[in-house]
């Protein structure tokens, strides 16, 4: 695998985490995949996922804005559930696996609304959260897991860009998928409008947590190499593209200083209201996200 140094660009750690650091991304000259090089050793990366990290965030008290914050977080899970509902009908006999489940709220919603057996995998143990009681939570990495029955639905919501072994993970996940099952993968889109707008201050350059950055072509190539068949590719996702627009503007204004998410809650929702006319066309504008729905090759 050859690296093209002319395509190297950088992401700064402190924009979301407050931790110092500058990390380089390079583009493979053979396959065009963009990835972090060098990267934090796998046994040290957990230090960058503290309780303030978005997917693991425990704080939910933001004063008068708390109801709005909780509604928005629940809306994200509702959008995930609506998206997967277009491709698979879940009931009490179904089995669902979420890789990189974080705080597990999506699985809790799926279990509560469909009765499906919900399993979550994450390397950070958040099993003490009350809603985790209804979830079969596995603390660890995907390659460390063993399952004796296949899953009807496997989801990777913004997990693959964090994974140190994405190709191996997809191949393993294919083996866990039922013959007629579906896998839903959502990641930031490198060839998006927001990347062109913000460049090195694009929120998708969330280093060192994001180790791989995917364009449409490199994402589809990776899933196909894993023996998966593309059912549909979407230029949007359940994660709100507006977050990348808001954070990208904030990163430019802050010029490298960390974004305090607690203080940003009010401006975030005010900006979302102003951007509402644009966001009506989120699914057509290629703003920030992409989703690919796949099945086992030859099973359709």
Show which residues each predicted segment covers.
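S-adenosyl-L-methionine-dependent methyltransferase catalytic module, highlighting the catalytic core
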Residues: 164-172, 182-298
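N-terminal juxtadomain amphipathic helix
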Residues: 1-63
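Short loop segments at secondary-structure junctions
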Residues: 30-31, 40, 217, 297-300
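Conserved SAM-binding loop and adjacent beta-strand
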Residues: 65-80
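Conserved SAM-binding loop
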Residues: 79-198, 211-225, 290-298
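Aromatic-acidic/polar surface patches that form glycan- and anion
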Residues: 17-24, 73, 77, 211-212, ...
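A structural signal for well-ordered alpha-helical segments within the folded catalytic domains
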Residues: 26-29, 75-78, 217
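Short glycine/proline-rich turn/loop motifs
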Residues: 60-66, 199-203
């Amino acid at each position: 695998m050859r690296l093209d140094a002319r395509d190297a660009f950088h992401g700064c750690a402190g924009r979301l985490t407050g931790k110092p650091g500058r990390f380089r991304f390079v583009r493979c000259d053979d396959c065009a995949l963009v990835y972090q090089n060098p990267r934090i050793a796998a046994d040290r990366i957990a230090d960058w996922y503290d309780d303030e990290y978005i997917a693991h965030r425990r704080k939910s008290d933001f004063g008068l804005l708390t109801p709005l914050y909780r509604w928005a977080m629940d809306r994200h899970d509702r959008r995930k559930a609506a998206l997967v509902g277009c491709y698979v009908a879940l009931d009490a006999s179904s089995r669902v696996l979420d890789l990189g489940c974080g705080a597990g709220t999506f699985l809790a919603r799926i279990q509560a609304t469909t009765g499906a057996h919900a399993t979550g995998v994450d390397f950070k143990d958040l099993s003490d959260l009350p809603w985790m009681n209804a979830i079969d939570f596995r603390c660890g990495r995907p390659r460390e897991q063993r399952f004796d029955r296949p899953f009807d639905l496997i989801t990777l919501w913004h997990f693959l860009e964090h994974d140190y072994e994405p190709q191996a993970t997809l191949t393993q996940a294919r083996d866990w998928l039922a013959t007629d099952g579906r896998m839903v993968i959502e990641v930031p889109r490198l060839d998006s409008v927001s990347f062109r707008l913000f460049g090195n201050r694009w929120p998708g350059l969330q280093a060192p947590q994001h180790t791989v950055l995917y364009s449409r072509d490199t994402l589809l190539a990776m899933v196909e190499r894993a023996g998966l068949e593309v059912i549909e590719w979407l230029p949007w996702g359940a994660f709100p593209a507006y977050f990348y627009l808001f954070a990208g503007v904030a990163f430019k204004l802050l010029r490298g200083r960390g974004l305090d998410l607690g203080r940003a809650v009010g401006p975030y929702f005010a900006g979302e209201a102003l951007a509402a006319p644009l966001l009506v066309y989120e699914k057509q504008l290629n703003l920030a996200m992409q989703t690919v729905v796949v099945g086992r090759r030859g099973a359709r």
